[in-house]
């Protein structure tokens, strides 16, 4: 039987996301989530059989949209360099709800919760193969160093695509050196670092 279309499920997801951020998944009660959502525990169980399923729904509600954008950004018809720029630009424009879900995922990883394994499985069937395919195309085309293990390339990309943007946004103007790029400008700088490193470029002798 199809469930009726109402705004209850989105309200539950929003309330759960905020509660999970505040108290963690294990520290949040369905009673508190129901109260925040203006509904009953029974309605939560109607849509989400367990608290863990509610957590995964909170993640998936945001992740599926990000995944679609990543898939579009990394379209194999595009040159690898352009794909990387588009990927980094997408992470430069993360919305608040997307950052909140990233925080939830990070919390689960730090706590080494059983839920994290399911998240890893989801990501291994989601954005990770899309990014890895782009990097392998880059080694084939000579854009990236094919002598390096593909997972090294993947980890380097992961380290540059998201964390610097989050740190830059959190620190704001409190950086010790003025004029630091942000947003898309920072994204392009980070792609350049990924492709060329931070050592000074050598000018060929004439």
Task: Please report, for each region that a protein language model flagged, where it lies by residue.
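N-terminal intrinsically disordered/low-complexity leader segments
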Residues: 1-7, 11-14, 18, 170, ...
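Helix-turn-helix
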Residues: 11, 19-53, 57
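All-alpha amphipathic helical-bundle segments outside canonical DNA-binding/catalytic cores
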Residues: 82-85, 118-123, 140-156, 184, ...
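Amphipathic alpha-helical linker/stalk segments
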Residues: 10, 58-86, 116, 131
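Short hydrophobic clusters on alpha-helical segments that form packing/core surfaces
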Residues: 12-20, 91, 194
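Hydrophobic/aromatic residues within well-ordered alpha-helical segments
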Residues: 51, 58, 62, 66, ...
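C-terminal peripheral helix-coil segments that are non-catalytic and often amphipathic
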Residues: 90-93, 97, 125-141, 156-206
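Amphipathic alpha-helical segments used for helix-helix packing
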Residues: 96-118, 167-173
